[in-house]
Amino acid sequence: MRVSKYLLSTQKETPANAEVISHQLMLRAGMIRRNASGLYSYLPTGLRVLRKVEAIVREEMNKAGAIEILMPMVQPADLWVETGRWDKFGPELLRFKDRHNRDFVLGPTHEEVITDLIRKEVSSYKQLPLNLYQIQTKFRDEVRPRFGMMRSREFLMKDAYSFHLDVDTMNETYEAMYTAYSNILSRMGLAFRPVLADTGSIGGSMSHEFHVLAQSGEDLIAYSTGSDYAANIEKAESPMPTEPRGAATEALRLVDTPNAKTIAELVEQFDLDITKTVKTLIVKGATEAAPLVALIVRGDHELNEVKADKLDLVASPLEMAPEALIRDAIGAGPGSLGPVGLNMPIIIDHSVSVMSDFAAGANVDDKHYFGINWERDLPLAQAADIRNVVEGEPTPDGLGTYAMARGIEVGHIFQLGTNYSKSMNATVLDENGKSQVLLMGCYGVGVSRIVAAAIEQNFDDRGIVWPEAIAPFSVGILPMNMHKSHRVTDIAEQLYKDLSAAGIEVLLDDRKERPGVMFADMELIGIPHTVVIGDRNIDAGVFEYKNRRTGEKQDIPFDQLVDFLKNAVKS
């Protein structure tokens, strides 16, 4: 491709409204342009990268035995009503009526459509197991689209759905998809981690997320220093206490704490050990008999809202009780709450159950109890794992301790079981002629999100540093003053032809531009290999080669360059 015939829309300045580096660089490199909030057009450079990601995803899905189909982006509301998600999904589901006043949605996902399709097309066990996938545009009406392609409203996704009559084949397909996703990200040259995950609104049992590691990642990953165990912080299991609860050594005493509204203030003012304090959070309960529930974690720990949401006594989705409701029920506000004398269900974290001589709010404004002990000052409360793990704690497999990393979720695989097939009556006849509800798996990859995540992991102060497999072009040719030198023009043109004939994707910068602009553009858009051609190089019989990732420069003889680049691109 010649730049003179190409739409290379680079920008020097960083757009003011671009918060993360991938958004900034995708705009500056001329990959995307904003049409409206969360809606973008792909320019040629961006589309080339997107198509390469898509091709790798498609190849690995086909290799894993999945079959490609295509379903409509517009979906009839009746299917969503059938599964109950018409009411559950919320405002992210964009709903509209056609001219006949029928309800439709723009699909954020396709479980309903694929289940409807399969219940009409598959009737016998002989047609199973079956794994179907598509690469299709999705739409989620995010309340606050941000971060460019990381959290846009419209995005490209690969979603696959498998159907089974038995758990064994469902497990086999799940493992095949796990391997396929690992292959996809490995082929793209990305550092990633598969992690155990919560199933979220889609539901189901087994679930893994695939995260591209990046400092800017929204998700916190807890992984083992001694094994392959890794989990999203929402799912990571806290270790059970190994030491018994210590004996009481302090008397219970009521202390005035007028300036201690937070654990940090309490610890600082009274020189307390933070591990000897607890914080009490009041959430809405699941029943009329218990409209409020107290959740208690150690002062240095954080409540895990996903774990708390799954407690039977807690209303789902989890909702913190407003201060007015708390004051009406307890007589004190946040900052002065604790378990002693609290007239509501109390659920404590396992780590709190072994605490002794600890401090907590006294349920009177500006007062705390010090020296609290279970089974002396109050009954031992129900205990559960309701906190986030912390670095250095032992992992559940016993093979290491927790370490933390940030990641960007780009893939998610689920075992759905019968969540959708049962509500939609998707059944087939088994080998005994009996009707059986289908088991399902669901496997998603954010194709457009991978592009942004790859940039978040691969950039420097000059621009994008693409991994070889998804770079828009492999080689950039930079002829110096080619419009003034016939020698430079002739050699640049010949090299362009030779590399193209060798199957290498080349971008020849044939513009009448200053060398500084040409170099800056090549580095900004992240082409892995550049070749500089000038009169001095020609006199010396060499090309100047530069590797974008390492910055390494070397002179390559004319007759060796094509083979050198073929090897460089392959590696």
Swiss-Prot record:
GO biological process: prolyl-tRNA aminoacylation
GO molecular function: aminoacyl-tRNA deacylase activity; ATP binding; proline-tRNA ligase activity
Reactions catalysed: tRNA(Pro) + L-proline + ATP = L-prolyl-tRNA(Pro) + AMP + diphosphate
Keyword NADP belongs to the record: no
Cellular compartment(s): Cytoplasm
Pfam families named in the record: HGTP_anticodon, tRNA-synt_2b, tRNA_edit
Sections of the chain in a coiled coil: none
InterPro entries xrefs: aa-tRNA-synt_IIb, aa-tRNA-synth_II, aa-tRNA-synth_II/BPL/LPL, Anticodon-bd, Anticodon-bd_dom_sf, Pro-tRNA-ligase_IIa, Pro-tRNA-synth_IIa_bac-type, Pro-tRNA-Synthase_IIa_type1
PANTHER family the record matches: MITOCHONDRIAL RIBOSOME PROTEIN L39/PROLYL-TRNA LIGASE FAMILY MEMBER, PROLINE--TRNA LIGASE
Quaternary data: Homodimer.
Domain free text: Consists of three domains: the N-terminal catalytic domain, the editing domain and the C-terminal anticodon-binding domain.
Protein name: Proline--tRNA ligase
Species this protein is from: Shewanella sp. (strain W3-18-1)
